[in-house]
Amino acid sequence: MFPMMTGFMNYGQQTVRAARYIGQSFMITLSHANRLPVTIQYPYEKSITSERFRGRIHFEFDKCIACEVCVRVCPIDLPVVDWRLETDIRKKRLLNYSIDFGICIFCGNCVEYCPTNCLSMTEEYELSIYDRHELNYNQIALGRLPMSVIGDYTIRTIMNSTQIKITTDKPLDSITITND
């Protein structure tokens, strides 16, 4: 009879322990129930990028000196820099600059090592297209700013606050800027 009594006590202890574990897991489940969802409904909500996000590369043609540092530091030799040596001034003249974002690994080495800061990383991450050849951006496509920068509230208020008007009583070379 004594072994039977210890068997019931062990069964009772195991039942209490199992009920405690079930209760603890149920409390954890209830604590997660009142949290906000962390998923983002992508096409309708855009994710907020971090400050040092490495998105599409922005290129300023006028600043580039065709030194080809970006090509040398790129792990896959991706930027294509076409230039011509001007013999009269003995300097390189940039003809064409292009990057294929289908191959780019967005490491940021070209931006970091550029001596004239003509390259910068934007916050643009939506580069999906149907034809992979459209991911080859030339200097014109690389020079476009992303829509998030153009549609910025501060830029819109600056553009709306100053209007350029040409007055007829002054010479045509003078422009009057008024705040409305």
Curated annotation (Swiss-Prot):
Enzyme Commission number: 7.1.1.-
Disulphide bonds in the chain: none
InterPro entries per record: 4Fe4S_Fe-S-bd (IPR017896), 4Fe4S_Fe_S_CS (IPR017900), NADH_quinone_OxRdtase_chainI (IPR010226), NDHI (IPR004497)
Gene Ontology biological-process entries: photosynthesis, light reaction
Cofactor: [4Fe-4S] cluster
Residue ranges annotated for the 4Fe-4S ferredoxin-type domain, each copy included: 55-84, 95-124
Keyword Transport: no
Catalytic reaction list: a plastoquinone + NADH + (n+1) H(+)(in) = a plastoquinol + NAD(+) + n H(+)(out); a plastoquinone + NADPH + (n+1) H(+)(in) = a plastoquinol + NADP(+) + n H(+)(out)
Principal subcellular localisation of the protein: plastid
SUPFAM superfamilies linked: 4Fe-4S ferredoxins (SSF54862)
Single annotated GO MF: 4 iron, 4 sulfur cluster binding
Annotated GO CC locations: chloroplast thylakoid membrane
Membrane topology: Peripheral membrane protein
Residues annotated to bind [4Fe-4S] cluster 2: C74, C104, C107, C110
Note describing how the cofactor binds: Binds 2 [4Fe-4S] clusters per subunit.
Keywords from the UniProt entry: 4Fe-4S, Chloroplast, Iron, Iron-sulfur, Membrane, Metal-binding, NAD, NADP, Plastid, Plastoquinone, Quinone, Repeat, Thylakoid, Translocase
Quaternary structure and partners: NDH is composed of at least 16 different subunits, 5 of which are encoded in the nucleus.
Biological role stated in the UniProt entry: NDH shuttles electrons from NAD(P)H:plastoquinone, via FMN and iron-sulfur (Fe-S) centers, to quinones in the photosynthetic chain and possibly in a chloroplast respiratory chain. The immediate electron acceptor for the enzyme in this species is believed to be plastoquinone. Couples the redox reaction to proton translocation, and thus conserves the redox energy in a proton gradient.
NCBIfam families cross-referenced by the UniProt entry: ndhI, NuoI, PRK05888.1-3
Family membership: Belongs to the complex I 23 kDa subunit family.
Name the UniProt record assigns to this protein: NAD(P)H-quinone oxidoreductase subunit I, chloroplastic
Lineage of the organism: Eukaryota, Viridiplantae, Streptophyta, Embryophyta, Tracheophyta
